[in-house]
A protein has these predicted regions:
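LRR N-terminal entry segment and analogous cap-like coil->beta motifs
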Residues: 10-26, 33-124
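Concave beta-strand-loop units of leucine-rich repeat
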Residues: 73-80, 93, 99-105, 116-134, ...
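C-terminal regulatory domains involved in ligand/effector binding and gene-expression control
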Residues: 2-6
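Short, aromatic/basic amphipathic alpha-helical patches
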Residues: 163-171
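Short, charged, surface-exposed secondary-structure boundary motifs
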Residues: 108, 161-164
């Protein structure tokens, strides 16, 4: 293979993994469809009432549609990207999201996350770590997550105006506990 073609192939494959299948969402419900998307992309999900992280696509629980509700998402080292974020729209019980070393997460993803009505109501904890494409703009977009109680930010070199960004965010979300580990 010529140099760069492997990267192009993986980029194409990741885009395929992130393509939203609206018929699938209708057929199996938002939580099952989102679980399939997240696991396909290398993320983990935890369902309500379960202490265990689900990581095996083939091990997804079966049962009545709507029985398993996603409560937490750990997207460490996953290939989730903006293109797949429509899967998040129908999720009503997600309280905790961790985005760590997600090379495709960028400001538009955080903006999309914060504009998702159900997440505005349910999301309480968000951790963003080592996502090199995130800038101040993406962090400022999080102000719409009005129920967010805890935000952890670490190793985000794209954040340049730290003091201003965090002051604006704290004013918008006065109950937010903000933990920073930034250079």
């Amino acid at each position: 293979l010529p140099p760069g073609s492997c990267r192009a192939f993986w980029g194409w494959l990741n885009a395929v993994f992130n393509k939203v299948d609206h018929e699938r969402i209708q057929a199996v419900g938002p939580d099952r469809a989102a679980s399939e998307w997240l696991l396909r992309c290398g993320a983990l999900v935890r369902f309500q009432g379960s202490p265990r992280w689900q990581q095996d696509y083939n091990g997804l629980p079966t049962g009545p549609l709507g029985k398993y509700k996603i409560e937490a998402i750990n997207a460490t080292d996953s290939c989730i990207m903006y293109r797949g974020f429509d899967y998040l729209d129908g999720l009503e019980h997600v309280r905790d999201i961790k985005l760590e070393k997600c090379m495709y997460i960028q400001d538009e993803c955080l903006q999309r996350l914060s504009e998702t009505n159900n997440l505005q109501k349910s999301l309480q904890q968000l951790k963003i770590i080592s996502c090199g494409n995130v800038t101040d703009r993406g962090i400022l977009a999080l102000h719409k997550l009005t129920n967010l109680e805890y935000l952890y930010l670490s190793d985000l070199p794209g954040i340049r105006e730290k003091e201003t960004t965090f002051r604006v965010l704290q004013q918008a979300l006065p109950k937010l506990e903000l933990e920073l580990d930034l250079e």
